[in-house]
A protein has these predicted regions:
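Substrate/ligand-engaging "lid" and interaction regions
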Residues: 1-471
Length: 471
């Protein structure tokens, strides 16, 4: 890939240096499109922060990248698309490279260890604490030179640092898990406590784990992407990744250096990651779910298509302005109105095909946080959030449509939801959902006015009475 002359390529400054300063677990598409791009921006001026990527399960991705000297194409997919070659990685390690992974984690020059392993990769129980019965945790606690879990690897690396009298690295979770830093820190201490009480105490007192929030829509790579990359750079790059131009990396200020100057690369360092998380959850995710259920009922299939429905787009905008934004706490450095405008602009991106049926999945788990918290916040403030009520009504109407068409409801409670939605009118369905605490906050059960409003909204959405629902 040294012959790439039709696309932005990494500067040679520092790129010949083999130095590794960051270890990353889980080199999937999001990491390569997001964190690696931030690091790539730093390397020309500071070559200390090359990444060693560790795949704990498979070798497919790392073999493809190693065959290209670690280089791959990042396609920015917006109305004005662009491509660049990322050269942030120095090594690619698989499950059989445990000795090298141990050596890197023990090396004091590695100061940051990041992870994108999905929520499941943290091996947490339903209450957010470490699941001691998880198969990978049980295996790693029994002792092994090649841990299978992220927790096992991090504790092994921190144990090596403590044994050598070296400073710990900074573990940084980068998955969409609320308070991910606090949860990971607690999991590390709990794991270590079983094996070595002194190490557990050292981790509890000396290791700082920042919470983070990451955001950038990253569609799966496909043949269309590979064809577009080939047409641009003249080579077939099947390690290419794509994302929208918007990227956000919010990192908790832990009062000590993280290693690389991530703020200089565009990350936000703050004492209020939770405020950013709440804004994303209620504005971006809440609007996403609203577009999904209302959009599907109105015949749209993607987010961009739903946003071309002027009535629906206007409704979502009004929901954010009137119901959601006033209930959000002030967050230093975050302009809520500018964030709202940016979110809606992102939704209009015609190049990113984000399917509504995917967003509509798992509604009973998502809606209490995406819309339900705003519903209750307004109720507690003495206001009726008509737009949020209407959005939840669209979910109910969607369930009814799916159940009565015999179409599967993709949700952990799918069978129960289908049974509820198959019987009675929309008002009855709302009553039964509230009674069983599915998708609607439990606090609603004791508020007759909210229940009645939800029943009316569900009926309007079911009947297609959009003028009244969106009014």
């Amino acid at each position: 890939m040294a012959t790439l002359d039709r696309v932005t390529v990494p500067s040679p400054v520092g790129r010949t240096e083999p130095h590794v300063g960051i270890v990353h677990f889980g080199p999937g598409a999001f990491h390569r499109a997001h964190q690696a791009a931030y690091i790539d921006d730093l390397l020309a001026d500071d070559p200390r922060w090359g990444i060693a990527a560790v795949s704990m399960r498979t070798r497919g991705t790392i073999e493809a990248l190693a065959a290209q000297d670690g280089l791959y194409t990042l396609a920015i997919r917006d109305a004005e698309s662009a491509m660049r070659v990322i050269g942030a990685h120095r090594e690619f390690l698989g499950p059989e490279d445990a000795r090298r992974t141990h050596a890197l984690l023990a090396d004091p020059s590695v100061e940051l260890v990041t992870a994108t392993v999905t929520e499941k990769g943290y091996c947490l129980a339903g209450d957010g604490t470490l699941d001691m019965n998880h198969a990978d945790i049980v295996r790693d606690l029994a002792g092994t030179d090649a841990p299978r879990s992220l927790i096992g690897w991090l504790v092994a690396g921190l144990g090596a640092r403590k044994a050598a009298g070296a400073a710990p690295f900074v573990p940084m979770p980068c998955d969409n898990l609320a308070s991910n830093g606090a949860k990971l820190h607690a999991a590390l201490v709990a794991f270590a406590r079983v094996r070595d009480a002194a190490l557990a105490d050292w981790i509890a007192g000396e290791v700082r784990v920042p919470s983070t929030m990451v955001d950038s829509i990253t569609p799966a790579s496909d043949a269309a992407l590979y064809d577009a990359v080939e047409a641009t750079i003249g080579l077939r790059d099947e390690a290419a990744v794509q994302r929208e131009s918007f990227a956000q990396w919010v990192i908790e200020d832990i009062g000590q250096p993280l290693g690389p100057d991530l703020a200089g690369a565009g990350a936000t360092i703050t004492n209020d990651v939770g405020g950013y998380e709440k804004a994303k959850l209620r504005i971006l995710n809440g609007a996403h779910s609203t577009l999904a259920y209302a959009g599907l009922l109105r015949g749209a299939t993607s987010v961009a298509e739903a946003m071309r429905d002027d009535a629906l787009a206007g409704f979502v905008d009004a929901m954010i302005r009137r119901d959601i934004a006033p209930m959000l706490p002030k967050v230093r450095g975050l302009d809520i109105d500018a964030y709202r405008a940016a979110v809606l602009q992102r939704f209009r991106n015609p190049v990113i095909v984000h399917r509504l049926d995917q967003i509509a999945q798992d509604g009973s788990q998502k809606l209490p946080y995406r819309l339900g918290d705003t519903l209750i916040a307004n109720r507690d403030a003495g206001t009726m959030p008509a737009h949020v009520v209407a959005a939840i009504g669209c979910w109910v109407a969607f369930l009814i449509r799916q159940a009565r068409a015999g179409t599967a409801i993709v949700d952990p409670a799918g069978a129960t939801l289908a049974a509820i939605a198959a019987e009675g009118g929309p008002a009855d369905v709302v009553t039964n959902l509230v009674r069983q605490g599915l998708g609607i906050p439990a606090a609603v059960a004791g508020d007759a006015s909210l229940v009645a409003a939800l029943q009316t909204a569900a009926s309007d959405a079911h009947d297609g009475n959009w003028a009244r629902l969106f009014g």
